[in-house]
Swiss-Prot record:
Family from the record: Belongs to the chibby family.
Main function: Inhibits the Wnt/Wingless pathway by binding to CTNNB1/beta-catenin and inhibiting beta-catenin-mediated transcriptional activation through competition with TCF/LEF transcription factors. Has also been shown to play a role in regulating the intracellular trafficking of polycystin-2/PKD2 and possibly of other intracellular proteins. Promotes adipocyte and cardiomyocyte differentiation.
Keywords: Cell projection, Cilium, Cilium biogenesis/degradation, Coiled coil, Cytoplasm, Cytoskeleton, Differentiation, Flagellum, Golgi apparatus, Nucleus, Phosphoprotein
Superkingdom of origin: Eukaryota
Biased composition (Polar residues): 1-10
Originating organism: Bos taurus
Name of the protein in its database record: Protein chibby homolog 1
Stored Pfam families: Chibby (PF14645)
Phylogenetic classification of the source organism: Eukaryota, Metazoa, Chordata, Craniata, Vertebrata
Region (Minimal region for the interaction with PKD2) residue spans: 60-112
Subunit record text: Homodimer. Homodimerization is essential for nuclear localization and interaction with KPNA4 but is dispensable for interaction with CTNNB1. Interacts with polycystin-2/PKD2 and GM130. Interacts with the C-terminal region of CTNNB1. Interacts (C-terminus) with TCIM (C-terminus), TCIM competes with CTNNB1 for the interaction with CBY1. Interacts with FAM92A; this interaction facilitates targeting of FAM92A to cilium basal body. Interacts with CIBAR2. Interacts with KPNA4.
Miscellaneous notes: 'Chibby' is Japanese for 'small'; the gene was so named for the RNAi phenotype seen in flies.
List of residues that carry Phosphoserine: 9, 20
Length: 127
């Protein structure tokens, strides 16, 4: 028997209400399309003056030429973009190396200045 009253007994939760009173889920796809007009067709969008449609998991330009840029031009631009990214990565690496060299040289110069100051103070004491 518990010291301060009865044992823990949570309140019973009320039963859930039915999720949907609609019978739309009972209809097959073709009936829903006819009755409700749910035939949307392929998704399309207009981006920067270029009309695209979604087919087989990919966005495809509706015209043969995608907004004035043909496939060869797009491929050339991709290659140029790749070259520029590689060049950018190389330049970042060079900057990192130069910064490392600068910090190393700065540390060495501070050490030399410190040694020089110590030698000057020792030579002053001897005089």
């Amino acid at each position: 028997m518990p010291l301060f009253g009865s044992t823990f007994s949570p309140k019973k939760t009320p039963p859930r209400k039915s999720a949907s009173l609609s019978n739309l889920h009972n209809l097959d796809r073709s009936t829903r399309e006819v009755e409700l007009g749910l035939d949307y067709g392929t998704p399309t969008m207009n981006l920067a003056g270029q009309s695209l449609k979604f087919e087989n998991g990919q966005w495809i330009a509706e015209t043969g030429i995608s907004g004035g840029v043909d496939r060869r031009e797009a491929q050339r631009l991709r290659r140029r973009n790749q070259q520029l990214e590689e060049e950018n990565n190389l330049l970042r690496l060079k900057v990192d190396i130069l910064l490392d060299m600068l910090s190393e040289t700065t540390a060495e110069s501070h050490l030399m200045e410190k040694e020089l100051d110590e030698l000057k103070s020792v030579s002053r004491r001897r005089k």
